[in-house]
């Protein structure tokens, strides 16, 4: 077990994960709990996948990409941009189709919280300037921990592109 020279992390995998045939996890990846990676999915180096993520078959995840908690990646998706928590991403150059509403309901989140997240999703992606949009909604959703998690994810790494809806 060796890691790349710039890092002291090799691979960290959570509990209760399913890696189907021919999936590949490269060096320095961090995988959360309850992750499902379908057939023929390679993860590039330094990828971070948070808890309860599902990645559909024949998708590929580019190096240094982050995929937020409870996100779902459709089959045959090329993941080049970070996917927000609870996001539903598809396409050969991934874009956000919307939110993983079924996953949120299965996790038994309150409908009011889910509806608040859906409204915040529209506000966050109202224009191409995410950080300007975030400053406009500052404090509006402070009682919704789902929205807080999405905002924290976006603000954590401002160098990486965030997957957004097609306009």
Label the model's feature ranges.
Residues 92-167:
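Terminal amphipathic alpha-helical/low-complexity segments used for targeting or macromolecular assembly
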Residues 1-6, 10:
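Single conserved hydrophobic/aromatic residue that forms the stacking wall/gate
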Residues 14-15, 20-21, 26-27, 32-33, ...:
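Left-handed beta-helix
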Residues 2, 18, 36, 54, ...:
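N-terminal alpha-helical segment
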């Amino acid at each position: 077990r060796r890691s790349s020279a710039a890092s002291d992390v090799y691979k960290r995998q959570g509990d209760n994960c399913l890696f189907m045939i021919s999936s590949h996890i490269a060096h320095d990846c961090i995988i959360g709990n309850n992750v499902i990676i379908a057939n023929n999915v390679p993860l590039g180096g330094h990828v971070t996948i948070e808890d309860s993520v599902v990645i559909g078959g024949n998708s590929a995840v580019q190096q240094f990409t982050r995929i937020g908690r409870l996100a779902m990646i459709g089959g045959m998706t090329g993941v080049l941009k970070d996917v927000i928590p609870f996001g539903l991403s598809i396409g050969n150059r991934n874009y956000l189709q919307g939110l993983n509403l079924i996953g949120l309901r299965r996790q038994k989140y309150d409908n009011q919280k889910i509806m608040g997240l859906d409204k915040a999703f529209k506000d966050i992606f109202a224009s191409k300037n995410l950080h300007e949009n975030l400053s406009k909604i500052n404090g509006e959703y402070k009682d919704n921990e789902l929205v807080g998690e999405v905002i924290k994810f976006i603000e954590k790494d401002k160098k990486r592109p965030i997957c957004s809806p097609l306009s």
